[in-house]
Amino acid sequence: MKRVATITIAVLALLGIVAASLMAAGCGSSTVSSDAVATVGGTSITSAQFQELMKQAKAQVTSQGTVFPAKGSATYNHYVASIVDYLVQSQVVAKSAGTFGVSVSDKAVSDQVAAIEKQYGGEKKVLAILKQQGMTMALLRQSIKDQKLAQLVAAKVVAKAAVSDAQIKAYWQAHAATLSKQKKTATLAKAKATIRQTLLDQAKQTLWTAWIGQRIKELGVTYAAGYDPAKLVASPSPSASVSPAG
């Protein structure tokens, strides 16, 4: 059965940006309520929100014929860290959207849901797909709203990203041995567009990372015991992860 493209758990990929990790941004757990996994600027991210995404992650892994990692294992901890990161970043974006004068209307979300239903053959079929993936219509709508809002904010944050001809030339000189082996990038002239996009993506990520870090400091992020991504992820990320949905 086809999967409705919805939510990015491992990383939030927007406009060619790999969103900044929040894993070093937290502080102590003394101010987090018992029914929350973290707070962002005083707003709680609830255990229910976390469990909803964990349920989705487990359903996706199971649907692929893979056994979900055991609780406490390094791979399991990476899932927890990634989900908490996603929820924290979504809250940071939501709290910052007003600064940029951007918002996402219920109509925009409903229009996207309608487009998905049309693509997959109607509401009943979409609901069946969502159930298979451990999701609900409410989660689908929330994920659409989060993604649309993040795209709008990201567009503002990275608007000034730029790449110079000098940077392109320097990149070519550093990677010519590899690029020249492929027909479409065999010369600087042919590779220029590819190099420009690569460098532009890097420039966007740099701006996004700096902005996220600054907003984290301004808002303040606190994690409940056992949910601090920096403490959960003490080893390199495993190869297996929840597939980002585009």
What is each stretch, according to the model?
Residues 110, 114, 123-124, 142, ...:
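Alpha-helix boundary/capping detector
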Residues 29-144:
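N-terminal targeting/tethering segments
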Residues 2-10, 21-34, 39-40, 65, ...:
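FKBP-type peptidyl-prolyl cis-trans isomerases
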Residues 1-75, 190-246:
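Short, low-structural-confidence N-terminal segments
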